[in-house]
Amino acid sequence: MTDKIRSVQGKVVSDKMEKSFVVAIERKVKHPLYGKFIRRTTKLHVHDENNEAKVGDTVEIRECRPLSKTKSWTLVRVVEKAVIA
């Protein structure tokens, strides 16, 4: 069985939890009737063992076994740090 582990990039929208954060993944979906592409956002809870990611960072995450009721993704790396203004 060759299951491919899903890996996606997204933006951190919340890091208020200990060893966890929330990532927003944006995708474009075609409207079934009118054909216009609409932006849809999915929020995922991600495990971050070392509390590396902060709000605004772009991160790469991958799917893993369920770690809690809502967490089944883990941090791979921080792709881009947020610019602090």
UniProtKB/Swiss-Prot annotation:
Claim: rRNA-binding is one of the keywords in the record: yes
Keywords attached to this entry: Ribonucleoprotein, Ribosomal protein, RNA-binding, rRNA-binding
CDD domains in UniProt: Ribosomal_uS17
UniProt cross-references to SUPFAM superfamilies, sorted A to Z: Nucleic acid-binding proteins
Disulphide connectivity of cysteines: none
UniProt keyword rRNA-binding, yes or no: yes
Entry's Gene Ontology BP terms: translation
Molecular function in Gene Ontology: rRNA binding; structural constituent of ribosome
InterPro entries named in the record: NA-bd_OB-fold, Ribosomal_uS17, Ribosomal_uS17_bact/chlr, Ribosomal_uS17_CS
A cellular-component GO term for this protein: cytosolic small ribosomal subunit
Domain of life: Bacteria
Protein family: Belongs to the universal ribosomal protein uS17 family.
Quaternary structure note: Part of the 30S ribosomal subunit.
Protein function: One of the primary rRNA binding proteins, it binds specifically to the 5'-end of 16S ribosomal RNA.
Protein name from the UniProt record: Small ribosomal subunit protein uS17
